[in-house]
Amino acid sequence: MTDVNPVAVVGIAAIMPMAPDADAFWANITGGRYCVTDVPPERWNPALYYSPDHSARDKTYSTIGSWVREFEWDPIRWKLPIPPTVSAQMDQGQRWALSAARRALMYAGWPKWTVDSDKVAVI
């Protein structure tokens, strides 16, 4: 490979369990915070999916995990072109991705930046 394209990371964001933003996530890491809990009842019912038998089909043998519980989602206030009916039907993962992308762009100076938007990407 001879072509090298430099990349500048100028904005960061994260939505993680017990960390609605990158700063809280870093604080959890540096503070050694344990972010694993029992499954919240709004996620799934352990009575339906749990089995202590590790070989049970269509079951899990664990009732713990890390769960995103808080993050900001306000597409109307953010003036995103997402109709409320579409927003209401979006998967939570899509909302997390859009919210984190928006926050990373803002961290980088958007919407007041003076860079060529064709050279901007969110990964």
Annotate each language-model stretch with its function.
Residues V115-S117:
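Terminal amphipathic helices with adjacent charged low-complexity linkers/tails
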Residues M1-S87, Q94, L98, R102-W110:
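ACP-dependent fatty acid/polyketide chain-elongation machinery
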Residues V120-I123:
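Extended hydrophobic secondary-structure segments that form protein cores and membrane-embedded regions
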